[in-house]
């Protein structure tokens, strides 16, 4: 057990259960402002991709927007505490709070019932176990529910509801298959045009080539994240030769392990991708929107099943499943030439049916009626 990780968890518990509730009670002296909506995140210094569509929608509706973004992983304890205090001050009187990941301050107190917290969870589908269903995410000794104040958790399809309820320790009625707001962008021609132009500028060497994107999830927890298979992808790129441009896009927790230079997010790379290689990442579900070939490269599959586990039968998903590097090149060539379009369609309908380009509209409707 990593002693630094354990100490960090106990500090979090102290701040969440003792300090922040006092700040909240002190600040909630005014009436709740139903025209005020707070967008907050502790993993990004700027607005996360997951929030863009809803942000544009609430601005169009004339709501007062407050943004509270800071990467707590980079900040000092005092800087993070200052940011938490700023959030609690606006949280105490805001009508709505929007988050897209675990956000400790929002769960630190018994919030006012008039304030609604919307969780735009960043991942589609429900593939690997997460949250309270695995100690890798939330240790058993951690006291408090980091998601308890969420009034609405948006998911990509009705199938996801019971699994999110279990992972988040929330009643099923709070898990709503309204769709994942950010996926609306995949249906907008202007967004696709912009990302293609940005891609051309960032990757001029890809001109005239097929694009292969490797986008794995991370292993372990956010504080001790690691990746699997990077050397194999490097060797694959050499085998594929000049016909392909191979791009690596790691989870945000792992970006620091790659050379700097790639400023495009995975969501911005998907529209220009001809073939995706992933493993247990929810990006697989995003990619179903484009109905293009994919390969699941999982060299640690047996170990992952034992230590983490899944909400579904992983082996039934579309795309070639490859456990050995020896089979990776052949699988990529085969899938690129001939892939099962019907399997992709059925998988989309089961796990992504609410991601139809109108998710933000449904979320806005809920927000107005809440």
Give residue spans per PLM region.
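Conserved catalytic-core segment of nucleotide-activated headgroup transferases in glycan assembly
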Residues: 48-56, 178-258, 361
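Nucleotide donor/acceptor-binding cores
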Residues: 34-35, 115, 209-212
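A short, gly/pro- and small-residue-rich
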Residues: 107-126, 230-236, 291-303
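Catalytic binding pocket for nucleotide-activated donors in carbohydrate/polymer assembly enzymes
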Residues: 282-351
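Donor nucleotide-activated moiety binding/catalytic core segment of transferases
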Residues: 81-96, 248-285, 289-290
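Membrane-proximal basic amphipathic "stem/tether" segments
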Residues: 1-36, 42-43
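Active-site and donor-binding regions of nucleotide-sugar-utilizing enzymes
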Residues: 36-190
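C-terminal alpha-helical cap of glycosyltransferases
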Residues: 355-370
